[in-house]
Amino acid sequence: MDALEGESFALSFSSASDAEFDAVVGYLEDIIMDDEFQLLQRNFMDKYYLEFEDTEENKLIYTPIFNEYISLVEKYIEEQLLQRIPEFNMAAFTTTLQHHKDEVAGDIFDMLLTFTDFLAFKEMFLDYRAEKEGRGLDLSSGLVVTSLCKSSSLPASQNNLRH
């Protein structure tokens, strides 16, 4: 095999694995946006959000909650992916994800990060608690809507685009 054939083979192999990765990420987006998943996650967070406090020290109760979350949510996502891709392997995907993390939409990556990064998991709960208690980020007072069109001296009923 000459060098050109080797490059071609590597390119087609890379493209196939990239296509598989992209397909999994697409399915993940569908699963995470699905009402069933949203309800599953919301019910779990409703059950435990009052346990979480915005302090440096972590309570002992956080560990079993984190483990239960991983078991429940990761298992659900893996089952959903296996229905769509029978040969799916979560461990292999997680490894591939580390190499492609810059290519994955932020919300998907953040969600997956909550399975492996305790601080991301805790932050998710703190954000949820703040939202439930009405302490969420409110940008409404800083928003101003400005028309991008020039105002016209014609009444609105006569201000039609002319082609």
UniProtKB/Swiss-Prot annotation:
Consequence recorded when altering M45R: In RP82; drastic decrease ARL2-binding, diffuse cytoplasmic localization, no enrichement at cilia basal body
Result of changing D110A: Decreases interaction with ARL2
Pfam families given in the database record: ARL2_Bind_BART
GO cellular component, one term: centrosome
Sorted UniProt keywords: Cell projection, Ciliopathy, Cilium, Cytoplasm, Cytoskeleton, Disease variant, Mitochondrion, Nucleus
Tissue: Expressed in retina pigment epithelial cells (at protein level). Widely expressed.
Function comment: Together with ARL2, plays a role in the nuclear translocation, retention and transcriptional activity of STAT3. May play a role as an effector of ARL2.
Disease: Retinitis pigmentosa 82 with or without situs inversus: An autosomal recessive disorder characterized by variable association of retinitis pigmentosa with situs inversus. Retinitis pigmentosa is characterized by retinal pigment deposits visible on fundus examination and primary loss of rod photoreceptor cells followed by secondary loss of cone photoreceptors. Patients typically have night vision blindness and loss of midperipheral visual field. As their condition progresses, they lose their far peripheral visual field and eventually central vision as well.
Family: Belongs to the ARL2BP family.
The protein's name: ADP-ribosylation factor-like protein 2-binding protein
Taxonomic lineage of the native organism: Eukaryota, Metazoa, Chordata, Craniata, Vertebrata
Gene: ARL2BP
